[in-house]
A protein has these predicted regions:
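Glycine-rich phosphate-binding loop
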Residues: 94, 98
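Acetyl-CoA-dependent GNAT
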Residues: 2-7, 11-17, 22-93, 104-106, ...
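Conserved GNAT acetyl-CoA-binding A-motif
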Residues: 111-122
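Conserved beta-strand-loop-alpha-helix junction that forms the acyl-donor binding cleft
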Residues: 121-131, 147-154
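Short hydrophobic/aromatic beta-strand or adjacent loop that forms the aromatic wall/cage
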Residues: 53, 156-160
């Protein structure tokens, strides 16, 4: 059995854009995406709403294998104590190696470092692996929007989860 090595987690840089865009396209699935599959020409991964500093990336053997996006859920000052996970992706080759868990733990630590008191996320109801992972890291279901999305002709719940920091 190979020795476990935790991924190296760091803040994204503009130089990561191409790899992140490819990872995002390669991991697209109706298990977690509510937008259509990306088609060329592909939009920029980073833009005025999606800045490199919003992303933590995971590397194994110096290869980018995952990311998590940590952002404000709203622009309201009254909500500034909350951060939200707004994207998590792990390459197929790195699944089952603890990359997703390491990214979630790094996001929790980073949200705390930035002064957040709560961390929230939304996950599709049929994404059982992600829901189990989030629950194992202390997230609880805080609300469900039944049948919020229609994906491939099937109505899917939108599940709000959160945890105190």
């Amino acid at each position: 059995m190979p020795e476990y090595r935790p991924p190296h987690i760091r803040t994204a840089t503009p130089a990561d854009e191409e790899q992140l865009a490819r990872l995002d396209r390669d991991t697209w699935s109706t298990l977690h995406a509510v937008t259509p599959r990306p088609q060329p020409p592909y939009p920029a991964f980073f833009d005025e709403r999606h800045l490199p500093e919003d992303y933590l990336v995971a590397e194994l053997d110096r290869r980018l294998v995952g990311y998590i996006r940590l952002a404000f859920p709203t622009p309201l000052a009254s909500n500034a104590h909350v951060r939200q996970i707004q994207g998590l992706a792990v390459s197929d080759r790195a699944r089952g190696l603890g990359v997703g868990r390491a990214l979630i733990r790094a996001a929790v630590a980073e949200a705390r470092r930035r002064g957040a008191r709560r961390l929230t996320l939304r996950v599709l109801g049929h994404n059982t692996p992600a829901r189990r992972l989030y629950e194992s890291e202390g997230f609880v279901v805080e609300g469900v929007l039944p049948g919020e999305f229609c994906l491939d002709g099937v109505y899917v719940d939108d599940v709000a989860m959160g945890r105190a920091l």
